[in-house]
């Protein structure tokens, strides 16, 4: 194994601390026969445990060794994988080196562990190659990554030669990209002593636009702007504003489920992180994806100045915002920044003779969102339609008049008519029906 790993060139930066790197070192020690057997076994078990932990996090199954090697290929960001992500299969000398590396990986895929297992009296590798994972709820592992790793792993295992292996890997890079950005739909920002990083959000909401009852014109505006963005045409930053509980956030979250396979990714950012926006944009501006930077429930009080960071990023900075980035925000306020009568009064505004400029600065933020979509509370008839549609989806077998009568009681006690209120009511009703059936 150590001789195979030493031949890696483009993928040779796995690091000595990687599982594959550690195992290669142990195999080299084993051939030297100077290291005590129990030390070698302990070293192997340490790496097998790491592999099992990784398999648990990503829901690997059947052949964990091949799953792990596939995961390495899918996440290793090197000059070849990053360029292939952008332009697809390359036609150049670099292919020679890539195919050589893939020949190594194909040999590792089918590596015979029986000799070392017999010599050390272990069977851990055989067990890893025929593994049956315990069922886990999808919220406990990264299902999206798991499905892609296992699907590609099976194809690579069946590849008859390095040429086919090469085509399968490059096709994956072109379709899904490379690294955690390629594998995951959504991310949050994490700031630390070593800078700003993106942390995958493993369990995203499964909502689709069709799940949001009503608001057809609003969804169509959002869909049209997003599809133009994905097609490389001109598109605008979008502000979804209006009443609480009307589906603004759900509409934006649905986009990554609708368009993930077309290269859409989402980065969620909070108000206190706006100063990190420039760093985040620098990280993703050259990647072959379209990123929506999502700001939920956006608003500012009069003494908050974070909106200045946002304005600089949206428009007006020295560096032009990359074409692969848009900002989508939701807010209960159309103007985003709280405006007081003090802003309009000459004498009460610290003698600011240019008070209209001060006012304009505050109001200009919402104007920088080229698409502004209003989500207002439904009327009574629309609320009834939402309730009955959700009840049908839930499979509730109650008469319509009973459902609507209970819905009216519920909304009077829970904040009025809205899509959120309707969903909360249906959740409650479904729970009581389950208790009754039991």
Which ranges hold each PLM region?
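Conserved AAA+ ATPase "SRH/arginine-finger" region at the nucleotide-binding site
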Residues: 348-363, 370-382
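Walker A/P-loop nucleotide-binding motif
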Residues: 233-252
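Conserved catalytic/switch belt of AAA+ P-loop NTPases
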Residues: 302-351
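N-terminal pre-Walker A segment at the start of P-loop NTPase domains
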Residues: 199-227
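C-terminal alpha-helical "lid" subdomain
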Residues: 372, 376-438
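AAA+/P-loop NTPase substrate/partner-engagement loops
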Residues: 258-291, 299-303
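Intrinsically disordered, low-complexity N-terminal extensions of AAA+/P-loop NTPases
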Residues: 1-157
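Interdomain "pre-motor" coupling segment immediately N-terminal to P-loop NTPase/helicase cores
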Residues: 135-198
